[in-house]
Amino acid sequence: MKAIKKIHIVPIDPRASTVHWRMADITGKQIVLEIVDGQPNFYENTLGVLTNSPGFEWHMTNLNNYINLYSGTTNPRTLGNIKLSSFGAGSGFLGIPGDITPPSRFIRAAFYQTSSPQKETAIEAVIQSFHILNNFDIPIGIEFSESETPTDIPSATQWTSSTDLTHRVIYYRTMYNSDIRCIDLKAIDFYRVKYQAVPLDLIKQQPIQPVRIN
């Protein structure tokens, strides 16, 4: 908390909506920072999930609306003299919201993250996190009406990232290239390297590897 007092938040893009920050350390402790009416608000984030508006406290309260959800498959039951059975596995999550609004994304992230199995290695955990994050890709155009032509990608998912705090490695993929890349922070001499902006994609194109069958 003492270090946060030295941070200055500067708006860069006037199109930016309300911003929410999630900060974590290698022990797993997380806090959320939201600025409301110019005032910083800090919350302990024991769930480890964060999306956009409304505020974090609202999202945590909204979780109670989905108390009926659980991982696994619903057991068969009878309705009068009719036997009812699940159509498929995972029906315990029947009713989980699937739209792209922040409240729905928060619910999906909360249940997917808490139901995922513990992995033995860091890279396995990173790969699993990307599988979860695949559920939150927003395609270009979905925020526009049918009469509008998208001229930009303000709300589409431009990149997805996962961070290994223990080994200090940042993994990411982009909307142009779904291959996972990484930045090893330990390999960077922050005392010597100059401040710079590096594009996430040197070439905005998805590489496709041909499979040959002889």
Describe the residue ranges of each PLM region.
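C-terminus-biased signal that marks the final domain/tail of proteins
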Residues: 6-8, 12-17, 26-28, 48-214
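Short, structured patches in soluble enzyme cores that scaffold and shape functional sites
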Residues: 23-27, 34-37
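Acidic, His- and aromatic-enriched active-site or binding-groove loops in soluble protein domains
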Residues: 33-51
